[in-house]
Amino acid sequence: MKGLVILVSLMCLALYNRICAYQVRGMRSDVLCGDIRFTVQCICNELGYFPTERLDKPCPWPNREKRSAPEDELAFEDYEDQDYFHPRALSIPSEIEHDNEKESDAFSILSRGKREIAFYQECCNIRTEHKCNRTTVSLYCRTY
């Protein structure tokens, strides 16, 4: 009986594999679930929100080309040592960290974790959902 309980527990843990994925409207293929930061960079490039972003590898969906700025348009010397530099850091603004958030943001901040807040700050307003490994995650995209 103990063996059966342990076996069922292990099966439940194996099946409960929550991996986040982010998807936007118009993309017909899956995104790379394991590398969220790089996937978000690809999404922002795909949408044209960060057209000057330089990507070090192709985006994780077929038939897509990476976008890059001409070498003389922007200087990235300070960031060449950092992998997959993003023009805006995926972080929580200091007002939110110190509980000085705007009243309109209060509900959304209370209902999201830190990682979700970071993505909410980067890409907002167009809500889409994508299923990846039995987990549904929303992505919000905003034009600047």
UniProtKB/Swiss-Prot annotation:
<feature type="disulfide bond" description="Or C-123 with C-132">
    <location>
        <begin position="124"/>
        <end position="132"/>
    </location>
</feature>
<keyword id="KW-0217">Developmental protein</keyword>
<keyword id="KW-0726">Sexual differentiation</keyword>
<dbReference type="GO" id="GO:0005576">
    <property type="term" value="C:extracellular region"/>
</dbReference>
<keyword id="KW-0165">Cleavage on pair of basic residues</keyword>
<feature type="propeptide" description="C peptide">
    <location>
        <begin position="68"/>
        <end position="113"/>
    </location>
</feature>
<dbReference type="GO" id="GO:0030154">
    <property type="term" value="P:cell differentiation"/>
</dbReference>
<comment type="function">
    <text>Controls sex differentiation and the formation of male appendages, spermatogenesis, pigmentation, and male specific behavior.</text>
</comment>
<feature type="glycosylation site" description="N-linked (GlcNAc...) (complex) asparagine">
    <location>
        <position position="133"/>
    </location>
</feature>
<feature type="disulfide bond" description="Or C-42 with C-141">
    <location>
        <begin position="44"/>
        <end position="141"/>
    </location>
</feature>
<dbReference type="Pfam" id="PF17558">
    <property type="entry name" value="AGH"/>
</dbReference>
<keyword id="KW-0964">Secreted</keyword>
<protein>
    <recommendedName>
        <fullName>Androgenic gland hormone</fullName>
    </recommendedName>
</protein>
<keyword id="KW-0744">Spermatogenesis</keyword>
<feature type="disulfide bond" description="Or C-33 with C-124">
    <location>
        <begin position="33"/>
        <end position="123"/>
    </location>
</feature>
<keyword id="KW-0325">Glycoprotein</keyword>
<dbReference type="GO" id="GO:0005179">
    <property type="term" value="F:hormone activity"/>
</dbReference>
<keyword id="KW-0221">Differentiation</keyword>
<keyword id="KW-0732">Signal</keyword>
<feature type="disulfide bond" description="Or C-44 with C-59">
    <location>
        <begin position="42"/>
        <end position="59"/>
    </location>
</feature>
<dbReference type="InterPro" id="IPR020382">
    <property type="entry name" value="AGH"/>
</dbReference>
<dbReference type="GO" id="GO:0007548">
    <property type="term" value="P:sex differentiation"/>
</dbReference>
<feature type="signal peptide">
    <location>
        <begin position="1"/>
        <end position="21"/>
    </location>
</feature>
<keyword id="KW-0372">Hormone</keyword>
<dbReference type="GO" id="GO:0007283">
    <property type="term" value="P:spermatogenesis"/>
</dbReference>
<keyword id="KW-1015">Disulfide bond</keyword>
